[in-house]
Amino acid sequence: MSETDTIVKGWHGKLNLVYADRSNSTQLIYNHQQAPLKVQRPFYPEGEKVCHSVILHTAGGVVGGDRLSYNLHLQPNAQALITTAAAGKVYRSDGLQARQTIEIKIDAGACLEWLPQETILFNGAIYRQDLRVELATGANFLGWEITRFGRSARGEKFYQGEWRSHTEIWQQGVPLWIDRQWLPGNDAVFHSPHGLAGQPIVGSLVWLGSPISTEIIEKARNLGNTQGEAGVTSLENGFLCRYRGASTSEVRNWFTSVWQLLRGEFFSRGKCIPRVWQT
């Protein structure tokens, strides 16, 4: 069997969502889904202004040859929070790459909080994720990515396989942040200070669209009181948090605290943890 034949038999999931502001209520006005991707019915735990959505991967995990495609569009003044129902799992590959592509467009006055749960790469996984965000003037984006290399609770290390993560965020044709990461699975890279330094978890949180004061950046740094390595970098009209360590709960707690800080600063919104994170 050729590689092309194998890829065709893999999952080719698609999820296209469009959100619109209707009289100060954000509505999911378009939803096209193709298995194994699915979105739950929208809900509003903090009022009609912010639409909460939960994405499900009904196959339970990703294997080599799978292709997952997301296309998200927030029309002017729409406000949405999107997360996932569970941690993503990328299983050991037989040589084929699994790939996830996310295209996001955020119009003027709109804001997306893109908060997926962590991705777990099994040893031997071959995985690539591409995320591209297009911001209009006056739009805001907050997103994070948390990746665990190997099932470390079982003592597994990422000594085989490959991980690529490409992120681009643009505003009016100007690149605000471009980040390309590549990690081949082997002992040397796992333990190298230029790789994982023996730590199985990395994470990035980025906020872009509105200028950030030095006071907010300093508060975000102070919230990063972790055993793992944590850093905060100022960006043009935003900032970036990075983590490298051994605890999913530690990085999630830090990122959640930063997210809540930004919500209060820019939108005067209170704490609203998605219920699915607590199940």
From Swiss-Prot:
It holds the Pfam family UreD. The keyword Ubl conjugation does not apply. InterPro entries: UreD. Its main location: cytoplasm. It is found in: Cytoplasm. One of its GO terms (cellular component) is cytoplasm. One of its GO terms (molecular function) is nickel cation binding. The keyword Cytoplasm applies. Keywords: Chaperone, Cytoplasm, Nickel insertion. UreD, UreF and UreG form a complex that acts as a GTP-hydrolysis-dependent molecular chaperone, activating the urease apoprotein by helping to assemble the nickel containing metallocenter of UreC. The UreE protein probably delivers the nickel. Required for maturation of urease via the functional incorporation of the urease nickel metallocenter. Belongs to the UreD family. This is Urease accessory protein UreD. It comes from Nostoc sp. (strain PCC 7120 / SAG 25.82 / UTEX 2576).
